[in-house]
Amino acid sequence: MSRLSLVLILVAGLFATALAGPATFADKNPIRQVVFPDELENGILQVVGQTRSALSFARFAIRHRKRYDSVEEIKQRFEIFLDNLKMIRSHNRKGLSYKLGINEFTDLTWDEFRKHKLGASQNCSATTKGNLKLTNVVLPETKDWRKDGIVSPVKAQGKCGSCWTFSTTGALEAAYAQAFGKGISLSEQQLVDCAGAFNNFGCNGGLPSQAFEYIKFNGGLDTEEAYPYTGKNGICKFSQANIGVKVISSVNITLGAEYELKYAVALVRPVSVAFEVVKGFKQYKSGVYASTECGDTPMDVNHAVLAVGYGVENGTPYWLIKNSWGADWGEDGYFKMEMGKNMCGVATCASYPIVA
């Protein structure tokens, strides 16, 4: 093996170990004293070259605490990063209503991303006729429930297709704050581990509407503190002593009825929704998202989120939606989606709970 190969392997090893965080080093370990972000940056550049794109990749890897196990993986991830960067730049030159940008998913292929981040069950058993009761009232031009203080902080689902659990807890946390005047964090992990009998599949997908039915039948949902998130399928550990919220019933929006969804978001509270994520969406950065590539049927939707408001940007009406990919993604963990066309099926599988 050449000396250069040995150096590159050492660089890769230092890179992976250092990004694991200081807790992985003993204080007496001399490596901890010399490995800093600028040194890691230089180490990556030794592997992938000295181009501007290589520098972007090095800084991306450091910012997002990436862990690569070998020189070969660094090279592979750099190539994927370049492909995504090319797509980002090509899109942003078109002057469309939304921008793409580098985020923690830029070193992932679409197949890798889809495996770990999408999880709303297809064929969501949407309600042909919902049970929301409408009245003759003029809806406000804009709404943002964050301003009312009932929307809980953005969470991150990790490498688990549990988006449906975060949509569920987001709706419940908002309903709880609205009803009782204080915040609460509820257990996604209980839904992952315990709600399988209600046509949910843990890290392999599920639906908020079915989760509401499970919680109603089960008698409640534990708090996050009592039943913390692991991001893996596990054995059910529900404890009645740790219940944070109970569900009395839920309200379903008629399939594809955006006015009903708008009515509920405007006058009731945040609503769990699902839509189809297609390839470019993972790099969303800002603006009003729209796509001609996504579908809008119950068989198309693959990601559950939480509609927390709506508005108008540059003349385009939009939904304001809370995601579960962390606060560094999109607009502080949120995105805007074009309203009025049932874009990507946003009003296809919508529901919200009534809590006690």
From Swiss-Prot:
Keywords: Disulfide bond, Glycoprotein, Hydrolase, Protease, Signal, Thiol protease, Vacuole, Zymogen. Predominantly expressed in stem and root. SUPFAM superfamilies: Cysteine proteinases. The active site is at 163, 303, 323. The keyword Protease applies. Its EC number is 3.4.22.-. One of its GO terms (cellular component) is extracellular space. Residues 1-16 form the signal peptide. Pfam families: Inhibitor_I29, Peptidase_C1. GO terms for biological process: immune response; positive regulation of apoptotic signaling pathway; proteolysis involved in protein catabolic process. Disulfide bonds join 160-203, 194-236, 294-344. It is found in: Vacuole. Residues 17-138 form a propeptide. Belongs to the peptidase C1 family. This is Cysteine proteinase 3. It comes from Solanum lycopersicum. The gene is CYP-3.
